[in-house]
Design a protein with these regions (language model features):
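Conserved ABC ATPase signature
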Residues: 110-114, 118
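ABC-family nucleotide-binding domains
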Residues: 145
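Hydrophobic anchor residue at the start of the ABC signature
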Residues: 124
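Conserved ABC ATPase "signature" region
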Residues: 77, 88-106
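Q-loop/switch helix immediately C-terminal to the Walker
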Residues: 60, 68-81
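Conserved catalytic motifs of ABC-family nucleotide-binding domains
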Residues: 131
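ABC ATPase NBD coupling module
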Residues: 30, 40-55, 82
């Protein structure tokens, strides 16, 4: 796990969206310079490869729900179904993602009935179900209790290690995130400074 810390307005979300490949095709803006992520120039993956390789979970979970499902299970299935995976594979991914995020009890609930913290965990489950090589979490713990954050960080750390995936956390506060990261950076004045 890698963490990038920064104050409000420091550019954390912009950097997260750039890493996710959202610029310039999905968000307006001008990019100068070049960079690579997962051995590919940023923003050059075809959409189907991008969604299967990189997932971004943002701070506002309600904006990331599809709006076209009637249960948490259907919401978590939405991404893998769009990859045209076999039904058995989709169900296995749903089960694993719901278990990892402690969302099994929410499986048959309508997404509109969830609390903020529950919705945040479901959106993370949706990203996990895509089995990305890179999972970007942009203040994705903001609505979780400290206990839920610790539990999820431990499970995500194990998940990333087992899969060989990279998780990049974008956060304002270092606690408890710094304890789970192999590298940490401070984003300030448009530059990244190493913390450890």
């Amino acid at each position: 796990m890698v963490a990038i810390f920064g104050d409000n307005g420091s550019g954390k979300s912009t950097l997260a969206q750039l890493m996710a490949g959202w610029y310039p095709d999905f968000l307006p803006g001008e990019i100068t310079g070049t960079g690579t992520l997962l051995c590919t120039p940023i923003g050059h993956l075809p959409l189907n490869e991008q969604s299967a390789t990189i997932q971004l979970v943002q701070q506002s979970p309600y904006l990331q729900l599809s709006g076209c499902t009637f249960s948490v299970e259907e919401e978590v299935a939405f991404g893998p179904e769009n990859l045209c995976l076999a039904e058995a594979e989709i169900m296995a991914r749903i089960d694993a993602a719901l278990t990892l995020t402690d969302c099994q009890p929410l499986r048959h609930r309508h997404p509109a009935t969830l609390s903020g913290g529950e919705t945040q965990r479901v959106v993370i489950a949706c990203a996990i179900a895509m089995q990305p090589k890179l999972l970007i979490l942009d203040e994705a713990f903001s609505r979780l209790t400290p206990q839920a954050s610790e539990m999820l960080l431990q499970r995500l750390q194990h998940w990333a290690f087992e899969r060989g995936s990279l998780i990049i956390l974008f956060e304002r506060h270092r606690t408890p995130f710094l304890n789970y990261c192999q590298q940490a950076w401070q984003l300030q004045n448009g530059a990244l400074q190493p913390l450890c």
